[in-house]
């Protein structure tokens, strides 16, 4: 399984998951169709699946046009997004499995950003890393805004993701890393690894290099939204427990 990253719009990423043996592809959260179609033409691959994490237009906007070119492609999304994802044919429940490229993804229910948000987790096989397509739930250095969910839901969702192996690659759907880490440093100014990461990301972005995928272990050590139970983070926002700490973090980030 190979993964191509397609930058689109101002800061979105579309991910094209490739099966070279079968010359087939699946696309994750196609905001628009044109770059996907162009890449598929250059590879001469057939699109067989569209994996949507949630219903926002910058994640599903390309569905219908892709289906016009590949009418047999199957559109997957969360069961609770019924009626909100264009062309959806498969309505996934938590714990469902999805097969592609001789790998099997587990469907994780991760509400918070939206009420129906799901993630696709491909566990490691042999010596490969796990692959997490988490949409707008977890970002490199941050997390998604809460549009339809509650802080308690988001903490539970992020805690699910936090349980995955440290070497899991995190394929989040936006290039928000620099601003996220600038905020994170206001919460943990003494976190040396965070300081180093911010410097590296700043340099990467100066050269227009992507910062996605990230690695989950790095997120656990430097992303405040996975560190709501770390004493230094709680003290920074005067949080009494995990949910209050997360709520105050999210409120500060919304104003940052």
From Swiss-Prot:
Name the HAMAP family for this protein: Glyoxalase_2
Q: In which pathway does it act?
A: Secondary metabolite metabolism; methylglyoxal degradation; (R)-lactate from methylglyoxal: step 2/2
Gene Ontology molecular function, alphabetical: hydroxyacylglutathione hydrolase activity; metal ion binding
Gene3D superfamilies xref list:
Ribonuclease Z/Hydroxyacylglutathione hydrolase-like
Q: Which SUPFAM superfamilies match?
A: Metallo-hydrolase/oxidoreductase (SSF56281)
Which terms does the UniProt entry file under GO BP? Answer: methylglyoxal catabolic process to D-lactate via S-lactoyl-glutathione
**InterPro entries documented for this protein:** Clx_II_MBL, Glyoxalase_II_hydrolase, HAGH_C, Hydroxyacylglutathione_Hdrlase, Metallo-B-lactamas, RibonucZ/Hydroxyglut_hydro
Cofactor, how bound (note): Binds 2 Zn(2+) ions per subunit.
Assembly and interaction partners: Monomer.
Q: What does the UniProt function comment say about this protein?
A: Thiolesterase that catalyzes the hydrolysis of S-D-lactoyl-glutathione to form glutathione and D-lactic acid.
What is the name of this protein? Answer: Hydroxyacylglutathione hydrolase
Q: Give the species.
A: Cyanothece sp. (strain PCC 7425 / ATCC 29141)
* Enzyme Commission (EC) number: 3.1.2.6
